[in-house]
Amino acid sequence: MIKIEVPATTTNFGSGFDTFGLALSLTNTFSVDFSDKYEVQIEGYSSGIPKDQKNLFIKVYKKTCQSIGKKPKPLKLIQENRVPPARGLGSSATAIVGGIEAALALHKVELPLKEKLKIAFEFEKHPDNIIPAFVGGFTVCATSESGVIFKKLPFPEDIKIVFVIPDFEVSTSEARRVLPKKVELKEAVFNVQRSALFVSALLTKDYKLLREAVRDKLHQPYREKLVPGLSEAILVSYKEGALATFLSGAGPTICSLTTENEEKIGEAIREVITKFSGYDAQVMVLKARNEGVKVYS
């Protein structure tokens, strides 16, 4: 069987809405081979994930086969889900990237990244999850008339990334619906300033700037109704020494950057989220992953 390992991703970093993405040390793994019929075996997180041809990985695999001029042959798929779905950690992106790489590996076809991205964007319109899942590391993405432009940048190795993952889901579509169609110029300027500051702080390792750099007025204030206790959790994280705290992707997961006290920060956030939402939450401490998707044959 061919094994495909795809990293989870976190995006936005507060001010970098639909722009910043980071590959993480947590992965989903997809093992595939040709078969007489489609067989899907799910391990790990499995609730709500189809075990037939409606499975996102299978749909992307079939589309990729068509794109490279190959007839989609049935697959046996073993899908090991370690990335919690619908939590703002790029679980869908892992399936999309995995499905593309599976079709290419099984048919021994190579495609440039630009062509892979064209297929991926048919399933996921926003590049901030997809691109770091392909290339790894910290990425800055921009869309243009000619396609997506991105730059991969180094992410500091001494920063630990604390995730507090509530036991409830927020779909991307739901998180998009609560956003306004228009924003005031001063709010757009607020985010432009801080997103530039964030990149500068990372590259120079001037971590004291990160707290201000992740402040946001474009999406988090509107998504707070979907994540009860978000503002309170951010405040308590700073009391425990966090460098920066924000929603991971569309949420409900909360992400905190730190160089120390990671367990205390995670537990403090977890207690606040549990108090305000009524749901428990899981704490994970991860690192940035410089590698993107890996294919083992």
Swiss-Prot record:
Recorded hits in NCBIfam families, A to Z, give: thrB
What this protein is called in its record is: Homoserine kinase
Iron found in the keyword field = no
> Where, subcellularly, is it found?
Cytoplasm
Q: In which pathway is this protein known to take part?
A: Amino-acid biosynthesis; L-threonine biosynthesis; L-threonine from L-aspartate: step 4/5
Annotated residues that bind ATP are located at: 84-94
Gene Ontology annotations of biological process type? threonine biosynthetic process
Q: Per its record, what are the GO molecular function terms? A: ATP binding; homoserine kinase activity
Presence of keyword Cytoplasm? yes
Q: Could you name the domain of life of the organism this protein comes from?
A: Bacteria
Q: Which UniProt keywords apply?
A: Amino-acid biosynthesis, ATP-binding, Cytoplasm, Kinase, Nucleotide-binding, Threonine biosynthesis, Transferase
Instruction: List, alphabetically, the GO terms of the cellular component aspect.
Output: cytoplasm
